[in-house]
Amino acid sequence: MNLIPEILDLQGEFEKIRHQIHENPELGFDELYTAKLVAQKLKEFGYEVYEEIGKTGVVGVLKKGNSDKKIGLRADMDALPLQECTNLPYKSKKENVMHACGHDGHTTSLLLAAKYLASQNFNGTLNLYFQPAEEGLGGAKAMIEDGLFEKFDSDYVFGWHNMPFGRDKKFYLKKGAMMASSDSYSIEVIGRGGHGSAPEKAKDPIYPASLLVVALQSIVSRNVDPQNSAVVSIGAFNAGHAFNIIPDIATIKMSVRALDNETRKLTEEKIYKICKGIAQANDIEIKINKNVVAPVTMNNDEAVDFASEVAKELFGEKNCEFNYRPLMASEDFGFFCEMKKCAYAFLENENDIYLHNSSYVFNDKLLARAASYYAKLALKYLK
């Protein structure tokens, strides 16, 4: 690998910062400590700093020269509601809160790149987006709705995530869908309760809800093109509390994922049609509440071509995978992808414990690798 020597020299200093963030994890939109630390460091490095963008988001801006070119680099800051089970000397000090997805590493790598870039000559504007609440709370959307790109516009935006694939390659990137969309649905099947001995005097919600559970599983197998990818997963089905009482309501909670917008739209249409048909056939009411967790993380071809050249320079072409099979997991960087030309990459964490696990450990070697990637992207574009 051909990492930036000055960044490698700063590795030890920023490992301590990463461990400090790891010890003090914060859930989405509660990243007060982390945001304050980020803002403090950026000010020390000479950036203009803007806080409370999307509640707890932070933006650092550094402009040099007279070019109108603008590049955005993004990192997420939030932790997960997990009790850490590692034996790390810097393990979480908070009960049931842990950096189990490596966002402490993402944040620190961007800070490391920020320090290095502040000492370099470039021509244009560097925007650093430190995003809150990636874990299902829509932090990217909150920043956008708070005027992120009106105030701090970028021609391209780049991000990355550590990924413990356990493979030989160090860097993964592809054109098109990198990660799936994620939509959550909460469905209420509303009947009329009654005594278990007299179902004819009630409107049992459990039977139509059971039909609904089965019918929803047919969406992918019977409607989605087999060459496309979609997942419908029912995670909760609840009704009643007693053996002799027909309840008023049954509830279903599920997630729906897709790798393209057409399939995503198709699954949504089928959900509503199935619910409508079952409601009519059983003379009950069905209410649907949909929440958009994340759009498809759709990489832009131009951005991928540019980032691929940077990755090959840094990691060597043999260590890069550009024909990567997309993940069905989601990432709210997808909201950025809907607005700007973006490229989202994975860096191998070299650890066999997967994300969102209480024993997960971020590999500190990635700090210099990711910071070098961030820095090369900026310097190559703003040359």
Q: Which residues does each PLM region occupy?
A:
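Non-cysteine beta-strand/loop elements that form the S-adenosyl-L-methionine
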Residues: G72-R74, Q83, Y185-I187, Y344-N349
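Metal-dependent amide/peptide-bond hydrolase catalytic core
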Residues: S210-K383
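Divalent metal-coordination and catalytic microenvironments
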Residues: I21, G60, L73, H103, ...
